Amino acid sequence: TFLGLGLEEKPWGPVFSMSNLALRTAAQANGVSRLHGEVSRNMFRHLWPGLLAEEVPIGHVTNGVHTWTFLHPRLRRHYAEVFGPEWVERPEDPETWRVEGLGEAFWRIRQDLRLFLVREVRQRLYEQRRRNGEGPARLREAEKALDPEALTIGFARRFATYKRAVLLFKDPERLLRILKGPYPVQFVFAGKAHPKDEAGKAYLKELVSKIREYGLEDRMVVLEDYDMYLARVLTHGSDVWLNTPRRPMEASGTSGMKAALNGALNLSVLDGWWAEAYNGKNGFAVGDERVYESEEAQDVADAQALYDLLESEVIPLFYAKGLEGYSSGWMSMVHESLRTVGPYFSAGRMVRDYLALYERGALWEKEARARLEALKAFAEALPAFHALGVRPEVPGDLTLNGGRLEVGAVLEGEVPEGLRPHLRVQLVVRRLGGGLEVVDLEEVAPGRYRTAFRPTRPGSYTYGLRLAL
């Protein structure tokens, strides 16, 4: 029944799951990053009870952003001049990102974009305070907010609790030491919570409250009325893009891709798209890939890792300026970020992946009638699959014969013609602490199958036989 397609049993009773309905009726399914695909396979493995998590048919195509939409016009012109016409035609091609040619002119544009960001923040902060009825002194302070020359870290996205906007305040004394240090650092926060997300709205209020409580309004600004224009100003002008989700809650995220396009460096937890983009030279990874059982322990560990990065890597690298007026080490990291993020996390690459992995239209049209007939026969025969069984034939002592394990199987039950082309007998082997291997057995006689498995590494193995379609 229709309701059965979405049915899921919960401890409190049956519920109708739209996710279950979609996965049971879709021809294809995918996550929007490599990690999201992995998480989704584990989340929905109950819909494929005969498969291991690695085999659940949910793939992934990592999100990408449209280069021309999110790249600042001045940088677009500069990139076109430096990279050449090939880049304009094929920005998703890694070979066209000749980043070595970027130099002082690129840095001057970056300085101008930061200045524009600071001016926009001042104007919005002034209007924000005027609208809230704050006094003349507070309005004058807004007109001088932030430093156009200081390292500027942006954080702009939907305010959900798992995104942990207040992670910076986990150790207030450590944060104050960083902000009151010899090098100026400033943060700009912007975003909205979903209207029905009361916890997210409370999180936003908590962020504003903590900034006021610790007297950091000269170094930290929270802007209201977040919109697409402000999002672009922030991704254009920030030097660093901060992202602190609680792993593995972030499906993909795209704001960091937009910031990287414009020359910012990502400072992010290894979640979503950054888990596959980070290579150790193109930005900064907060913490590692561990997931703690306790959210509190996770927050403490990630906060300490964030403070360490700011103190020992991000801030010193940005201010290690040479005679040319900028840090060559910082510029090298920006080059690597542009080279790796620009082409690989573009909408062009994303669309190409979808076409290659999921678009079957032309093939289906060509073979539509034959497929429909085969599908009809398969559907009619499918109920008989559950009556089939497989009996193993293996040596009693499991002695390896010349380094191989000889495995045989006998099929039990009558196989309908509609299932015969699709039926497979498989040996499933897993090494203790290692990965999974699946080997199809060869039919050597009617209803009898055999294969030989040769371990590639020493160790303890578990194995089993199964029927698959």
Regions found by a protein language model. Name each.
Residues 397-403:
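Short, solvent-exposed loop/linker segments at the N-terminal edge
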Residues 404-439, 461-468:
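Beta-strand-rich binding/interaction modules
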Residues 398, 441-442:
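Short, exposed beta-strand/loop patches in secreted or surface proteins that constitute
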Residues 1-369, 384:
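Catalytic cores of carbohydrate-active enzymes across secretory and cytosolic contexts
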Residues 361-397, 434-436, 469:
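A structural signal for beta-strand and strand-to-loop patches characteristic of beta-rich domains
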Residues 447, 455-462:
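Short tyrosine-centred short linear motifs in exposed loops/low-complexity segments
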Residues 286, 453-455:
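Hydrophobic residues in beta-strands and at strand termini
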